[in-house]
Structures are given as structure tokens and as C-alpha cells.
């Protein structure tokens, strides 16, 4: 059962981490697992509405259906005596996008591998590296946790510089984040996360060199633990920034948006867990007004 609990926590972090990175909702991302835990993740997400892989695309009146399958591997480590996780994830995306390009209707169906993501997280306070027995004791008397993570997104996805819509972004991205978990009781937790996502340049974008300012994000989660491996949460985030420059021209696409979501995770067999998640746009200034469903 402890391993099933660890899997349920890490599965959500892995799948959400390869959504649009600044928009992700990741409850319990820094909750520890026993050292030596290994998790294979198979997941699926569906998003419908005003959503694009890349909001710099000059497409208006967007109506998309985006699907993503995910294969990921999670390894729990002990770094400097602290509980840590290494996550490697490879998504495959497919879907259809419709909209207007200079008042002309346009659409495209697409499928292919998106960009590879690698994340390393370390719990700096409150969660040392633990055996299964120590983890069981921690779960019954949890302490406040301070964690940090670094995610690298590599430009490995499929990309065609003659197309507006691509599966890969053709640029490097780096996200740093701090997370804090505050136990209110053995059943209730509060999660807080703050991060910054930095982008490299895309020198082959169809409309000219593309540059983008960082996107800053904050999350809060209210979590209820029902039994070992079974928990639910209400999730909220806010993200801002990300103004883009295309061929030297600044766009008016600064994001100041937020999303609301809910998550349920429960064990289905020894060493296995199922996660269901749903999120919607709440406050939308630019893009991100879409519904998303997740299952792993």
C-alpha cells in the first residue's frame, strides 16, 4: 500500500507536467515516497476549446480538440539524505485545430511526438529519504515539507518550419519551482507552489525568430486524504507573463489567467493507482479558455 500511495502522487505530477507547463495543476507534487520506489506511468489527457500548443500562432476564433498520451518513468532517489524524484516523460499528441488566419478559415489535423521532459525534485525540509517503514510512520504524523524542482523541456518533438501548428516547440524551456506542503491534520493538507518558466528562442518559426518572456505561476491546493492511496483535491492556479516577440515585433499576448480543477486518486490493485482530473479556465485574459480531462 505505501508504494501504491507513492505511485498515485507521482503519476499526477508526471502527467500534468507535460501539459502547457505554466498552466499545470499539480497537487502533492512534493509529497515523498519510500526510497527505491519506481513508477511506470501511462496517461491520457483531452482538452477542448480555445487552446493551442503555442499561443503565438496568429490564429483567431480557435476551436481545438487536443489529445495527449504519456509514457513516463519516475524513480525515487536519496540526494544528500533527502527524498527526491527523477521524472522522465515522453508525450504523443494528436488532434485538430480550427480557426481564422487573416479572416480566412483554416484547420489542421496533426499527430506526433511532442517534446521530452526531465524533472528533478528535492525535498529540502521535512521529508528525509525514508524506508517503507519510516514512510508509514511519516504518513500518520506528517510534517511541513519544503521542496524545489527543476524541469528541462528538450526540443525533441516533431517540427516543420513551414507549418503554423506543430507537435514540438523547437526550443528549449526550463522551469524552476518551490513547493510547500502544510499538514492541517492527518487528513487535510494545503499545498503552495510558485514557479518560473523560461524559454529559449525558436529561430525557425514560420513568421520569423520567436522570443518569449518568462511566465510566472502560483498554485494552491486543498487536499483531503481518505485512506492510504485514496485522496482528492481542489486546485487553483494563476500565471502571468509570457509576452512574445516575433521577428522583432512585440505581441499583445501577456497572459494573466487562472484555472480551477479537481483531482481524485485511488488504488485499484497492489502497487497500482488510478488518477482522474478535470480543470477549466476561470479567469482568462489571453487564451487558456478550455476544459481538460486527465486519466492515468
Language model feature labels by segment:
Residues 94-211, 252-253:
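Outer-membrane pore/translocation modules
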Residues 204-296:
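Outer membrane beta-barrel transmembrane domains
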Residues 50-51, 81-84, 127-128, 187-190, ...:
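Repeated loop/turn-to-beta-strand initiation elements of outer-membrane beta-barrel proteins
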Residues 36, 63-71, 111-118, 144, ...:
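Residues that define the transmembrane beta-barrel architecture of outer-membrane proteins
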Residues 42-44, 71-75, 118-124, 150, ...:
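Residues on the lipid-exposed face of transmembrane beta-strands in outer-membrane beta-barrel proteins
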Residues 38-40, 84-88, 118, 144-150, ...:
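Transmembrane beta-strands of outer-membrane beta-barrel proteins
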Residues 47-68, 104-106, 161-166:
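Surface-exposed strand-loop-strand hairpins of Gram-negative outer-membrane beta-barrel proteins
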Residues 44-50, 90-96, 124, 152-158, ...:
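Transmembrane beta-strands of outer-membrane beta-barrel pores
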Amino acid at each position: 500500500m505505501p508504494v501504491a500511495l507513492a505511485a498515485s502522487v507521482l503519476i499526477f505530477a508526471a502527467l500534468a507536467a507535460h501539459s502547457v507547463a505554466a498552466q499545470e495543476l499539480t497537487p502533492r507534487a512534493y509529497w515523498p515516497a519510500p526510497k527505491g520506489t519506481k513508477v511506470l506511468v501511462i496517461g491520457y489527457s483531452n482538452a477542448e476549446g480555445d487552446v493551442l500548443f503555442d499561443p503565438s500562432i496568429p490564429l483567431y476564433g480557435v476551436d481545438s480538440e487536443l489529445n495527449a498520451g504519456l509514457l513516463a518513468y519516475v524513480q525515487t532517489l536519496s540526494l544528500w539524505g533527502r527524498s527526491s524524484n527523477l521524472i522522465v516523460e515522453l508525450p504523443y499528441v494528436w488532434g485538430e485545430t480550427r480557426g481564422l488566419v487573416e479572416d480566412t478559415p483554416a484547420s489542421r489535423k496533426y499527430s506526433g511526438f511532442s517534446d521530452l521532459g526531465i524533472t528533478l525534485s528535492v525535498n529540502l525540509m521535512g521529508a528525509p529519504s525514508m524506508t517503507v517503514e519510516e514512510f508509514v510512520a511519516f504518513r500518520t504524523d506528517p510534517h511541513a515539507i519544503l521542496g524545489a524542482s527543476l524541469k528541462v523541456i528538450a526540443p525533441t518533438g516533431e517540427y516543420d518550419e513551414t507549418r503554423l501548428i506543430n507537435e514540438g516547440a523547437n526550443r528549449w524551456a526550463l522551469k524552476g519551482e518551490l513547493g510547500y506542503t502544510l499538514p492541517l491534520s492527518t487528513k487535510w493538507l494545503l499545498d503552495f507552489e510558485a514557479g518560473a518558466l523560461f524559454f529559449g528562442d525558436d529561430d525557425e518559426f514560420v513568421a520569423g525568430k520567436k522570443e518569449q518572456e518568462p511566465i510566472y505561476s502560483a498554485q494552491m491546493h486543498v487536499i483531503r486524504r481518505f485512506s492510504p492511496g485514496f485522496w482528492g483535491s481542489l486546485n487553483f492556479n494563476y500565471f502571468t507573463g509570457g509576452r512574445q516577440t516575433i521577428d522583432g515585433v512585440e505581441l499583445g499576448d501577456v497572459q494573466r489567467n487562472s484555472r480551477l480543477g479537481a483531482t481524485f486518486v485511488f488504488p485499484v490493485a497492489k502497487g497500482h493507482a488510478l488518477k482522474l482530473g478535470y480543470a477549466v479556465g476561470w479567469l482568462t485574459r489571453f487564451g487558456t479558455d478550455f476544459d481538460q480531462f486527465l486519466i492515468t
